[in-house]
Amino acid sequence: MAKCQAVFLLVGALCVLSLAGVANAAENHFKVQGMVYCDTCRIQFMTRISTIMEGATVKLECRNITAGTQTFKAEAVTDKVGQYSIPVNGDFEDDICEIELVKSPNSECSEVSHDVYAKQSAKVSLTSNNGEASDIRSANALGFMRKEPLKECPEVLKELDLYDVKAN
């Protein structure tokens, strides 16, 4: 009889613990990570002479797809290796979430391109309903541009077989 009661008690405890896990699963917690660099050749991608940026400010903003209203906003500053991390609570399945550059710590490398073709933000998916198992979301690297390209840029572009591209 005592064994039977112990088994029922153990089964009941397991049921309660499993329900607690289901209750916690309803709230999503994500971490958005990314990197900021100085685009030393003004070509909108990293090269071997690009530099990481400590102290750069980025913002994460989510907007509802249909209404266009802002549903989430947070800022972060890059660390000594140029990386940032933004904690996010909630699920934003019906939103477009983007990381944008806000402020550069380097006045010589502080321009954000506004050309139509330029990558001005990095999109991230902040929902658990997309097949991604991890709660860490990695954003593409974003770069501030130098006011003038470095003198080594033509050589670097040639190494990449980009002969017709000119650092602007």
UniProtKB/Swiss-Prot annotation:
Disulfide bonds join 38-109, 41-153, 62-97. Residues 1-25 form the signal peptide. One of its GO terms (cellular component) is extracellular space. This is Pollen allergen Che a 1. Pfam families: Pollen_Ole_e_1. Keywords: Allergen, Disulfide bond, Glycoprotein, Secreted, Signal. It is found in: Secreted. PANTHER family: F28N24.16 PROTEIN, PROTEIN DOWNSTREAM OF FLC-RELATED. InterPro entries: Allergen_Ole_e_I_CS, Pollen_Ole_e1_allergen. Belongs to the Ole e I family. Glycans are attached at residue 64.
